Amino acid sequence: DEKQHIVKTFFEKYPDSVFEVGESHMYLGNLYMLDYADVESVVIDGNRLILPLKEKNEAKHILIEWYHAQATDVVFKRVQYYADLMGATYYSINLSDAKARWGSCGAKQTININWRAVMCPLFVIDYIAIHELSHIQYKNHSREFWKRVETIMPDYREAQEWLNQNSRLVSIY
């Protein structure tokens, strides 16, 4: 039936990663072609994402570690930038491995951001940060919450749309 056809087409379009040369991987919203070379650590060179050839059997692990390191730098800086801009005080920022959410704000002002967010464009990372920081003041998704988000990021709906259209590309790990 039509529903099965749509699901089949979706998974053909976005197959699971097997970490072969030429495969596409996303970082900061850009697609890079996977390659292997005699390098010590992950390198971006033009449109190539190069992993150490000597560790090819550990490619998934190596790439996830690299994404974590990038997220610790990029995502944490974006959260801090928007916290300062919004006058939001948080207790800590942590990376999460949640399968179904991009972020959360705990009762004790702990901001949790999915490490996969670093695969998204910066404007999407910004939206995730603003969304979670807004929860420090508003613990729900009330009209006031969304007004707060929109005050900081008037085009936040574009980021939501990007996430809706591209989540599969960044959730293959």
Stretches found by the model and what they are:
Residues 1-127, 136-173:
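Active-site-proximal or metal-binding-adjacent scaffold patches in catalytic folds
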Residues 132:
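Walker B catalytic acidic pair
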